[in-house]
Amino acid sequence: MKALLPRTLRLIRRPAWVAATCLLLMGCGPEARRAPGGVTDRQQQEPAISGSGNILAVLVEQRGRPTVQLRDLRTGQPLPTRHLNRHQPHSSPSLSWNGRYLAVITQRGNRRMAVIEDRLTGRAHPLRSPGNHDPVRLSLSPDAQRLALQVSDRGRWRVELLDLSGVLEADRPGGLRLSTDEPTP
């Protein structure tokens, strides 16, 4: 009977191949579920979530312009931004670990620039990229000590890394010590 079956059918009859095929067709893990507080009725784009998973940033249309909106995922409540409403449209939101810092690209006149809002102190930190190139996308490191900027430079894409350690205080996961001279009890 083996001789009558094509080689590929003989391979499929083996239990290991059957199991592997089933895994590929069904997926490797449990089905993802919608998190509470994670959905609103507005059209949303470019999601970014804080490292702690507690704050969501999305772009929504306000007065015909993309505007960043923050939401506390524990309560479902919107969170205010202090400086960003003056400079729109927004693009490419990125959050630090606890959501203290929100980085976004804004439009000021005919120039695009990266701005980081410190939600704890209320300060805005406008950043110009070296060479004064227009930013296209950005990504803030979880501790807010580095910013990766994709820029357009004479028709070519380039990524620039900015060191923010002299500008921003680090945003570390809760309970993480910076240093200690005393032994832990």
Stretches found by the model and what they are:
Residues L25-G27:
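C-terminal motif of bacterial Sec signal peptides marking the signal peptidase cleavage site
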Residues G29-E31:
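Bacterial signal peptide processing site
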Residues A57-R63, A103-G109, A148-R154:
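Beta-strand C-termini and the immediately following turn/loop, strongest in propeller blades
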Residues R65-Q69, R111-V115, R156-L162:
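Structural motif
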Residues G37-R42, R82-H87, R128-G131, G175:
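Surface loop/turn motifs at the tips and blade-to-blade linkers of beta-strand repeat domains
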Residues P47-I55, P93-Y101, L138-R146, E182-P185:
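Blade-terminus and WD-like Trp-Asp/Gly-His loop motifs, strongest in beta-propeller folds
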Residues V39-R82:
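Post-signal-peptide N-terminal segment of Sec-exported extracytoplasmic proteins
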Residues L73-G76, D118-G122, L164-S165:
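Short loop/turn segments that connect beta-strands within beta-propeller blades
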